[in-house]
């Protein structure tokens, strides 16, 4: 089940390697007010005069941490649960990233004492508001591409052509599906079909080439249904796999094993399946181009595609035909997206092309650096694929 990303806007490419080191991929959050949270730079955020003592915001700079793991570790250090913390969006793990984080009922002096390798907390602000998912304008990306296949004048010509791109195909990037284990959408499809056993084995079992030796052995044991031994063999870092296996051993129910996951993680599986089908919608629309056509539903004057749910708003015209054909092929119905206690998924629409802001590059030795800004919800890897993937 590939990730449905196979169309390109140009025939130019440079080749190359990204993320050799975390410092090669810098993600700096841009606040709703347009402030770029620059790596290594302190910014003053003024305290609210009528502070009621509830919320504190801070900038989290992290290296080689997921956002969720970083916040979980910070919460542990200050003696609070993760639910006391809020953030606007997840940032890449194998990268250097910045973002604002809000916390409730946490003492400032406790936050200021936190010292964790790869994590810096700064720019504290006393405020009366939460930070919710989506509370950002977007992100600035500074990405080093190492060992490009093209050199000298050829490289410069390709970069000049590619950097003229104003838009990109707004695919959901590989992070949506799992960078090392791109199976999240497969789990989601099993859940939509109410095949809880298949979903359990896809998530906890099903060894893949990039799995390390210990987790690969544990996943093989899951597929053999030797769950007690699999639980012992999974490294403790595989927190959710271990919890799910334990829940299955205790209850004998694959569905109940999924219910021990936090709501945001349960949502992730269905969202990934929706995203997988959305990527296919882009591929199907590609042959018609992305100029608005009769029947399109526009977002910011750009044609949008469906993220299927229990209240899917279909386009009409050619775009509507594409969406309904995929929906019917998958044997979907509104009720499929109402999954009881697991969650309900209303559906949405998403622009099929995204705008690139302030794109520039510079060449250094055997690498080049790209810098650009994207609005929230857009993936840098969907821009990068135009640069580094060979277009056959």
Curated annotation (Swiss-Prot):
This is Probable tRNA pseudouridine synthase D 1. NCBIfam families: tRNA_TruD_broad. It comes from Methanocaldococcus jannaschii (strain ATCC 43067 / DSM 2661 / JAL-1 / JCM 10045 / NBRC 100440). It catalyses: uridine(13) in tRNA = pseudouridine(13) in tRNA. It is an enzyme of class 5 (isomerase). GO terms for biological process: pseudouridine synthesis; tRNA pseudouridine synthesis. CDD domains: PSTD1 (cd02577). Belongs to the pseudouridine synthase TruD family. Keywords: Isomerase, tRNA processing. Residues 167-354 form the TRUD domain. It comes from the Archaea.
């Amino acid at each position: 089940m590939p990730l449905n990303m196979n169309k390109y806007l140009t025939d130019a490419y440079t080749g190359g390697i990204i993320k050799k080191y975390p410092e090669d991929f810098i993600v700096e959050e841009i606040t709703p007010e347009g402030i770029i949270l620059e790596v290594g730079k302190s910014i003053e955020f003024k305290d609210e005069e009528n502070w009621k003592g509830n919320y504190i915001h801070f900038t989290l700079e992290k290296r080689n941490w997921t956002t969720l793991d970083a916040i979980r570790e910070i919460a542990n250090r200050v003696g609070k649960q993760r639910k006391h913390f809020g953030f606007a969006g997840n940032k890449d793990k194998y990268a250097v990233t910045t973002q604002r984080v809000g916390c409730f009922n946490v003492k400032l002096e406790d936050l200021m004492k936190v010292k964790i390798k790869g994590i810096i907390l700064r720019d504290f602000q006393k405020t009366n508001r939460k930070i919710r998912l989506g509370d950002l304008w977007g992100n600035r990306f500074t990405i080093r591409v190492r060992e490009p296949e093209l050199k000298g004048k050829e490289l410069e010509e390709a970069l000049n052509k590619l950097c003229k791109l104003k838009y990109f195909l707004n695919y959901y990037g590989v992070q949506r599906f799992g960078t090392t284990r791109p199976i999240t959408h497969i789990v989601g499809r099993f859940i939509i079909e109410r095949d809880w056993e298949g979903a359990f084995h896809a998530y906890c079992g099903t060894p893949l080439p990039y799995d390390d030796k210990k987790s690969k052995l544990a996943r093989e044991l899951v597929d053999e249904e030797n769950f007690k031994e699999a639980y012992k063999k999974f490294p403790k870092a595989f927190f959710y796999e271990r919890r799910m296996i334990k829940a299955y051993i205790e209850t004998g129910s694959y569905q109940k094993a999924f219910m021990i996951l936090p709501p945001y993680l349960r949502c992730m599986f269905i969202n990934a399946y929706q995203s997988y089908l959305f990527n296919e919608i882009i591929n199907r629309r590609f042959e018609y181009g992305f100029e608005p056509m009769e029947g399109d539903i526009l977002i910011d004057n750009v044609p949008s595609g469906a993220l299927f749910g229990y209240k899917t708003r279909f386009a009409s015209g050619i775009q509507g035909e594409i969406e309904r054909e995929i929906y019917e092929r998958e044997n979907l119905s509104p009720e499929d997206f109402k999954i009881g206690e697991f969650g309900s998924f209303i559906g949405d629409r998403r622009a099929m092309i995204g705008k690139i802001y302030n794109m520039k590059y510079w060449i250094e030795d055997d690498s080049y650096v790209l810098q650009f800004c994207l609005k929230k919800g857009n993936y840098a890897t969907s821009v990068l694929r135009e640069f580094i993937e060979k277009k056959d």
